[in-house]
A protein has these predicted regions:
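FIC/Doc superfamily catalytic core
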Residues: 1-226
C-alpha cells in the first residue's frame, strides 16, 4: 500500500497494540463458548438481528442520519419502506450488512467495492448517479468543518482504479502471504485506505466500515457479527 506520492506506508506495532490483538484473537475468534445451559445457537438469530440493526443505525448516525433509534428499529423490524433520507441510509446499511454475511468467502474486487458503495448510498446522494461510481474530479477533500482547513487531499481521481485494484489484492492476502499482516490490522488498513483514497464523492465512511466488517468476518472473527 502506498500514499499518493508512491511512498510505501510503514506499519508499527507497539506493545499495547500487540496486547490488544492478542485479546481480540482470544475473545473474538475460535469456538463459541458460553457458561449457560442453553446453547448459544438457539439465540443466534435473535442476537444477530439485534446486532445488525444496531450497526446499521449507529453507522448511519455517524454519517448524519437524524432518525431516532426507536423509529429506525421499528422500520427494520416491520419491514416497511424508508420514508426519508435518514431512514434510507439506515435501510441501505442494514441491507448491505446482511449481504456481507454471504460475501465473506468471496474475494474482494474493485467491482465489489463499487457494488457495496452503490448498495450503501442508493437514493441518498445529491446526484443519484454517483452511487457505485468513482469520483470524477479532485474537488473532494477532508476538511475541518470548524475552520474550513483542508486536512487531507486524496489522490488524483485518475489513479483510483489502480489503487482499488492494489487494495483488493492486499485485502485478499492470507496468513501465508509475505510480509505477514495480522488479520485485524489488515481490516483496519482497509478502513484507513478507503478514508485516505476517498474514492467516492460521498459514502466513503460507510464503505470503509462495511469493508472492515467483511475483512474481519472473512478472517473468522465471528464476534464481529454480533
Amino acid at each position: 500500500l502506498v500514499d499518493k506520492h508512491g511512498h510505501a506506508f510503514r506499519l508499527a506495532t507497539p506493545e499495547p497494540a500487540l496486547i490488544a490483538l492478542h485479546h481480540i484473537d482470544r475473545d473474538a475468534a475460535g469456538q463459541i463458548r458460553t457458561e449457560f445451559a442453553t446453547p448459544i445457537h438457539e439465540n443466534r438469530d435473535r442476537y444477530l438481528l439485534h446486532s445488525l440493526i444496531e450497526e446499521s443505525i449507529t453507522s448511519s448516525q455517524l454519517e448524519g442520519a437524524s432518525t431516532t433509534r426507536r423509529v429506525a428499529e421499528a422500520m427494520l423490524k416491520e419491514g416497511r419502506k424508508p420514508r426519508d433520507h435518514g431512514e434510507t441510509m439506515i435501510f441501505n446499511n442494514y441491507r448491505t450488512m446482511e449481504q456481507l454475511r454471504s460475501l465473506r468467502g468471496e474475494p474482494l474486487t474493485p467491482e465489489l467495492i463499487l457494488e457495496l458503495h452503490r448498495m450503501l448510498t442508493l437514493d441518498t446522494l445529491e446526484n443519484h448517479a454517483d452511487a457505485g461510481r468513482l469520483r470524477r474530479t479532485n474537488d473532494v477533500n477532508v476538511v475541518d468543518n470548524r475552520y474550513g482547513t483542508v486536512l487531507h487531499a486524496p489522490p488524483h481521481f485518475e489513479e483510483l482504479p489502480e489503487r482499488l485494484a492494489r487494495l483488493s489484492a492486499f485485502a485478499n492476502a492470507d496468513e501465508h502471504s509475505t510480509p505477514f499482516v495480522h488479520p485485524v490490522i489488515r481490516a483496519i488498513l482497509l478502513h484507513f485506505m478507503i478514508g485516505y483514497d476517498h474514492p467516492f464523492v460521498d459514502g466513503n465512511g460507510r464503505t470503509a466500515r462495511a469493508l472492515f466488517y467483511w475483512s474481519m468476518a472473512r478472517s473468522g472473527y465471528w464476534l464481529m457479527e454480533f
